[in-house]
Amino acid sequence: MLTLIQGKKIVNHLRSRLAFEYNGQLIKILSKNIVAVGSLRREEKMLNDVDLLIIVPEKKLLKHVLPNIRIKGLSFSVKVCGERKCVLFIEWEKKTYQLDLFTALAEEKPYAIFHFTGPVSYLIRIRAALKKKNYKLNQYGLFKNQTLVPLKITTEKELIKELGFTYRIPKKRL
C-alpha cells in the first residue's frame, strides 16, 4: 500500500524516465503521453499500485513499447509483460511497489483513459446502459454490432457527453 502523495511522487519521477528500446535505440516516452489512471487518478487516499497509461503514437511501435520498457535510474523487475499490459515491481525509497503499465494508440486515448480510470462498478453501469442500445464500450473504442463507431472526440469528457451521460470527475465516480 502507498498513499496518494507517494503515488503522485512516483508518477512525477517516472514522467522523465520512461523509455523503450526499438531497433537498438532508446526512445524516450514523452511526458504528455503518460497518463495516471486507476485509483491514483480517482485520488483515493490509499493505493494498492500505480497505474499508468502510455499513449503510443504509431501502431507499428505498439508491440515494442512494454516488452522493451526501461526506467532510467530506477530498479525494477517484470512480473508479467505483453503488448498492452505490463506489471512491474519498482524499488522506490527502499520499498517495493507494483506499477501497472497499459498502452493505447492515440485514437484509443479517451476510451482507454475512461476504461483504466474506472472504478469497475461505474464502468459496469455505463456499459449496461449502452448494451441496452446494442453498443459495446471498451478501452479500444465504441462498437455497434462489432463495428467501430467513429466518434469525433479527443477527451474522456467528450466521450461521456457523446454517449449521453453526465461527466463525473474521477474522484466522484462510484
UniProtKB/Swiss-Prot annotation:
**Intracellular or extracellular location(s):** Virion
The outcome of changing residue 115 to F is:
Slower dG:dGTP misincorporation
Tell me which residues are marked as the site Stabilizes dGTP in a syn conformation to overcome the Watson-Crick base pairing constraint.
115
List every stretch annotated Involved in ssDNA binding. Answer: 42-51
Q: Which Pfam families does this entry report, sorted A to Z?
A: DNA_pol_B_thumb (PF14791), NTP_transf_2 (PF01909)
Q: Which domain of life is it from?
A: Viruses
Q: Which InterPro entries match?
A: DNA_pol-X_BS, DNA_Pol_thumb_sf, DNA_pol_X, NT_sf, PolB_thumb, Polymerase_NTP_transf_dom
The family database entries (SUPFAM superfamilies) matched by this protein are listed as:
Nucleotidyltransferase
Catalytic activity, as annotated: DNA(n) + a 2'-deoxyribonucleoside 5'-triphosphate = DNA(n+1) + diphosphate
| UniProt enzyme class | transferase
Q: Which UniProt keywords apply?
A: Disulfide bond, DNA damage, DNA repair, DNA-binding, DNA-directed DNA polymerase, Magnesium, Metal-binding, Nucleotidyltransferase, Transferase, Virion
Per UniProt, the cofactor note for this protein states: In the presence of magnesium, pol X shows a strong preference for the ssDNA gaps having one and two nucleotides.
Positions annotated to bind Mg(2+): 49, 51, 100
Task: Give any Gene Ontology cellular component.
Answer: virion component
Q: GO annotations under biological process? A: double-strand break repair via nonhomologous end joining
- The EC number(s) given in the record are 2.7.7.7
Cofactor dependence: Mg(2+)
Spell out the disulfide connections: 81-86
**A GO MF label:** DNA-directed DNA polymerase activity
Q: Which family does it belong to?
A: Belongs to the DNA polymerase type-X family.
Q: Domain note for this entry?
A: Small DNA polymerase formed from only a palm and a C-terminal subdomain. Unlike other polymerases, binds DNA via the helix alphaE. The total DNA-binding site of pol X is composed of two DNA-binding subsites.
Functional summary from the UniProt entry: Error-prone polymerase lacking a proofreading 3'-5' exonuclease which catalyzes the gap-filling reaction during the DNA repair process. Specifically binds intermediates in the single-nucleotide base-excision repair process. Also catalyzes DNA polymerization with low nucleotide-insertion fidelity. Probably acts as a strategic DNA mutase, which gives rise to a rapid emergence of variants. Generates mismatched G-G pairs, in that case, the polymerase first binds the deoxynucleotide followed by mismatch formation.
Something else the entry says is: Consistent with its intracellular location, ASFV encodes its own replicative DNA polymerase and three base excision repair enzymes: a class II AP endonuclease, the repair polymerase Pol X, and an ATP-dependent DNA ligase.
**Can you say what this protein is called?**
Repair DNA polymerase X
